[in-house]
């Protein structure tokens, strides 16, 4: 299955045709797809109307610098801010993180979007792409926040996606633009980077997004298309039974798998349920690549939200217990 990117704030005729394809699981939205709160709700409705089956609509609405929807949405703090607060006031920090998850999920669902790929559970150890997107550099603190965030997302009716497995935070390179390799053995990763993923899986996380990072002491290829990482470690040793997403196959670190078709097949063959094709110019070739493949369409049903909440429904359901932890940490809408 593929999650595809579309070009703008409205669907083109070609994009409507793509949504008819059996292999299209849904759409990933970006800043380029956002004009306003009402517009993104209309786009979400148009995507669903164009598809002959239920589809998944996703976004990265983490907070901080990775927040695709801004105008009319709450300005969400980066996750690192909660980790910084934790040393002085752990219970308050966890309460604020739960409120962050509930607010984000509620606003995203009110726009007709099913899920934000969240939370980031990488360790915050200097990676150029992760930065303040991570809760902390301490595995146990990240694990504690991961449990709280997953539970809060579920309470708001949104599936939780742990990213980026098995841990992107320790390498320096940004895999959007460069190849990345982590030389540590599996035992070192299990003692540190995998700790938050174990916590998230135990908390009932619904999905995991893979990292385009190579761990040569574990497997020769990037984790995103490594059967050892996905089938043997994540599913076999760690017992994960949810959906496995690739990261975007347009990123530089995925190019080692070859051309577009090679990248799609490599990720699916390794055990990814869904491949992210975020660049519209890669969609047609990706669809051609999966023609004739057997597709796991049932895997995504549990990720689709409990129906579009709508902004009226969100506001009607908001009470003081929900907004109290938010005002100090988030302030006003962006």
Swiss-Prot record:
InterPro entries: Beta_hexosaminidase_bac, Glyco_hydro_3_AS, Glyco_hydro_3_N, Glyco_hydro_3_N_sf, Glycoside_hydrolase_SF, NagZ_Beta-hexosaminidase. Disulfide bonds: none annotated. Keywords: Cell cycle, Cell division, Cell shape, Cell wall biogenesis/degradation, Cytoplasm, Glycosidase, Hydrolase, Peptidoglycan synthesis. The active site is at residues 176, 247. It is found in: Cytoplasm. Its EC number is 3.2.1.52. GO terms for cellular component: cytoplasm. It comes from the Bacteria. Pathway: Cell wall biogenesis; peptidoglycan recycling. Belongs to the glycosyl hydrolase 3 family. NagZ subfamily. One of its GO terms (molecular function) is beta-N-acetylhexosaminidase activity. It catalyses: Hydrolysis of terminal non-reducing N-acetyl-D-hexosamine residues in N-acetyl-beta-D-hexosaminides. The record marks 174 as: Important for catalytic activity. Pfam families: Glyco_hydro_3 (PF00933). PANTHER family: BETA-HEXOSAMINIDASE (PTHR30480:SF13), BETA-HEXOSAMINIDASE-RELATED (PTHR30480). Plays a role in peptidoglycan recycling by cleaving the terminal beta-1,4-linked N-acetylglucosamine (GlcNAc) from peptide-linked peptidoglycan fragments, giving rise to free GlcNAc, anhydro-N-acetylmuramic acid and anhydro-N-acetylmuramic acid-linked peptides. Its main location: cytoplasm. One of its GO terms (biological process) is peptidoglycan biosynthetic process. Substrate binds at residues 60, 68, 133, 163-164. This is Beta-hexosaminidase.
């Amino acid at each position: 299955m593929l999650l595809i990117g579309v070009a703008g704030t409205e669907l083109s005729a070609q994009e409507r045709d793509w949504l008819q394809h059996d292999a299209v699981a849904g759409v990933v939205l970006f800043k380029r797809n956002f004009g306003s709160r009402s517009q993104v709700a209309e786009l979400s409705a148009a995507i669903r109307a164009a598809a002959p089956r239920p589809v998944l609509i996703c976004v990265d609405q983490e907070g901080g610098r990775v927040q695709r929807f801004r105008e009319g949405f709450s300005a969400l703090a980066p996750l690192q801010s909660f980790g910084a607060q934790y040393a002085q006031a752990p219970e308050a920090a966890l309460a604020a993180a739960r409120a962050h998850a509930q607010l984000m999920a509620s606003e995203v669902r009110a726009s007709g979007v099913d899920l934000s790929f969240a939370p980031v559970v990488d360790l915050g150890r200097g990676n150029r792409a992760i930065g303040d997107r991570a809760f902390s550099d301490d595995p146990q603190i990240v694990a504690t926040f991961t449990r709280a965030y997953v539970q809060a997302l579920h309470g708001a009716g949104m599936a939780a996606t742990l990213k980026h497995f098995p841990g992107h935070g320790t390498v320096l390179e940004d895999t959007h633009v460069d190849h990345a390799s982590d030389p540590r053995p599996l035992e070192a990763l299990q003692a540190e980077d995998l700790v938050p993923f174990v916590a998230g899986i135990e908390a009932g996380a619904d999905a995991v997004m893979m990292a385009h990072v190579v761990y040569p002491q574990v497997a020769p290829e990037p984790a995103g298309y490594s059967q050892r990482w996905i089938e043997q470690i994540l599913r076999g040793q760690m017992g994960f039974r949810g959906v496995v997403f690739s990261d975007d196959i347009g990123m530089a670190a995925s190019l080692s798998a070859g051309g577009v078709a090679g990248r799609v097949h490599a990720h699916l063959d390794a055990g990814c349920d869904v491949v992210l094709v975020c660049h519209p110019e890669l969609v047609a070739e990706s669809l051609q690549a999966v023609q004739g493949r057997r597709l796991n369409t049932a895997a995504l049903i549990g990720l689709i939200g409990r129906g579009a909440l709508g902004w009226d429904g969100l506001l009607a359901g908001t009470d003081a217990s929900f907004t109290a932890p938010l005002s100090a940490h988030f302030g006003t809408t962006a």
